[in-house]
Amino acid sequence: MPTRETVQRYFEELTRKGNWESLLSEDLEFTSFTSPVKHVTGKAAYLESTRRFFSMIKSLEVRDLIIEGTKACALTRYQLQSPAGSFQSDVAELFTVTDDRIHSLAIYFDTAPFPK
């Protein structure tokens, strides 16, 4: 499956709370360029470190998707719900796709809207 299809399917599955995890490589490299920067290796570690975020997603919009070979950049807007209320987060997500799986993911976003 080409890079575009893999990344689009990831977002489609994530939106409908489907089987998006199946698109992740077991040796996924994840970096969150927030303060402090967080880096984890492995699908299980990624899922554990992002569980709170994924539990808050009400909806998401892929505002732009740029593909070049095995690389993809998605500009996304998440509508999120926490016990403290609703908020949105704009995120830049950089993917590397290998063998139809997401091998690396780096994200950039402002942490200010997130509840402490």
Regions found by a protein language model. Give the residues of each.
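Short, surface-exposed coil-to-beta transition loops
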Residues: 58-61, 86-93
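Short, aromatic-enriched amphipathic alpha-helices that serve as compact interaction elements
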Residues: 1-16
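Hydrophobic beta-strand positions in extracellular immunoglobulin-like domains
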Residues: 78-80, 97
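A short hydrophobic beta-strand element
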Residues: 69-78
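A solvent-exposed, acidic/Ser-Thr-rich amphipathic alpha-helical stretch
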Residues: 4-5, 18, 25-69
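Short beta-strand edge/turn micro-motifs at domain boundaries
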Residues: 93-116
